[in-house]
């Protein structure tokens, strides 16, 4: 089954892969898909989301005119971080040492296509020890909503990430932990 999501955010390219707010938000769904499908997931990243294809093509053309005597690797220095350029050129099947003034219109179009859809293969998630948020835990069906007391065990209360709830990044999970902790603690104190 195909699954897609159009989201806009800042991504972070790290030594182990991609990270950042949107990656963290997608990680629960991606982890479930990886587990269910037993196959890698292809992520397409628009490296220039503020520009339409046509505007990006014009921008690349201007840069290529400015750096016409440079190698392709150096002719893209104003467009991308230096360490990302070889990755993009590799996906566009372009030689980084090729002079910019020898890039054909078709090659330039292929480059823009990669800039608008860099393909990254997701092979897994980071280990639990590195998790910022975890999914899973005690089902909310087994918990009294106002007191956070167990419906199955008298005197047992739950709070935070032991409960099967999780939210997007941005403090929602911390707020859930604080609020459920307060509610469970207050209820337990008055038991």
What are these regions (language model features)?
Residues 11-16, 156-158, 181:
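Short hydrophobic core segments
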Residues 19-22, 138-139, 162, 169-173:
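Gly/Ser/Thr-rich beta-alpha loop segments that engage phosphate groups in nucleotides
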Residues 86-166:
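A glycine-rich dinucleotide-binding beta-alpha-beta segment and adjacent secondary-structure elements
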Residues 165-191:
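A conserved FAD-binding loop/helix module that cradles the flavin
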């Amino acid at each position: 089954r195909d699954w897609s999501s159009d989201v806009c955010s800042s991504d972070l390219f790290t030594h182990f892969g991609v990270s950042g707010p949107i990656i963290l938000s997608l990680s629960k769904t991606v982890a479930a898909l990886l587990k269910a499908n037993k196959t890698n997931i292809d992520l397409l990243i628009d490296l220039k989301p503020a520009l339409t294809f046509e505007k990006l093509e014009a921008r690349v053309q201007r840069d290529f005119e400015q750096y016409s005597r440079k190698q392709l690797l150096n002719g893209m220095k104003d467009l991308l971080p230096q360490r990302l350029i070889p990755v993009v050129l590799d996906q566009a099947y372009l030689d980084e040492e090729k002079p910019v003034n020898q890039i054909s219109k078709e090659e330039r179009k292929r480059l823009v296509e990669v800039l608008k859809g860099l393909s990254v293969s997701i092979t897994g998630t980071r280990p639990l020890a590195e998790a910022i948020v975890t999914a899973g835990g005690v089902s909310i069906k087994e918990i009294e909503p106002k007191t956070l007391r167990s419906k199955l065990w008298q005197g047992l209360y739950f709070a935070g990430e032991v409960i099967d709830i999780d939210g997007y990044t941005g403090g929602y999970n911390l707020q859930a932990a604080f609020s459920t902790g307060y509610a469970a603690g207050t209820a337990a104190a008055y038991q």
